[in-house]
């Protein structure tokens, strides 16, 4: 499949560097879309699966202005210290993870929840039973209901 950055390399400095390059590209793309369509962050929901979740969390929380919300599936925070140092807002976040995920360990859901709580960011988390590294219908329903509440 497609990936934003290479997670096969286990050097944390390399991973963070590659991640930040991808983050800059995504931020630039979002800025272009916001300018073209005259839309503000508070009207945008950032969402992603796996690395897309990781990107959504970082881009969402390091933006000058908060987004409507972040919805992440089966991801993690790439570097807790980096995000803590660069966080600029308190965008509400929903994180969903499968308990049988063998690609991105479900322990990362707990690490992310701890980070959000320590940073006083509203976070809702769901650990889906008997779920590997994919998005089941249950997760989609949870996410849809969350987004519908946020965009009203």
Positions of PLM-derived features:
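Serine-hydrolase catalytic machinery in alpha/beta-hydrolase-like enzymes
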Residues: 1-39
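C-terminal catalytic histidine-bearing segment of alpha/beta-hydrolase fold enzymes
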Residues: 110-152
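Short beta-strand/loop motif that positions the catalytic acidic residue
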Residues: 94-97, 101
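A short beta-to-alpha transition loop/helix N-cap that caps and shapes the active-site region
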Residues: 1, 77-82, 103, 135-136
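Primarily recognizes the serine-hydrolase "nucleophile elbow" in alpha/beta-hydrolase
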Residues: 42-89
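Short, proline-enriched alpha-helix->beta-strand connector loops that line the catalytic pocket
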Residues: 88-93, 119-122
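Cofactor-binding loop segments of dinucleotide-utilizing enzymes, especially the Rossmann-like FAD-
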Residues: 75, 98, 130
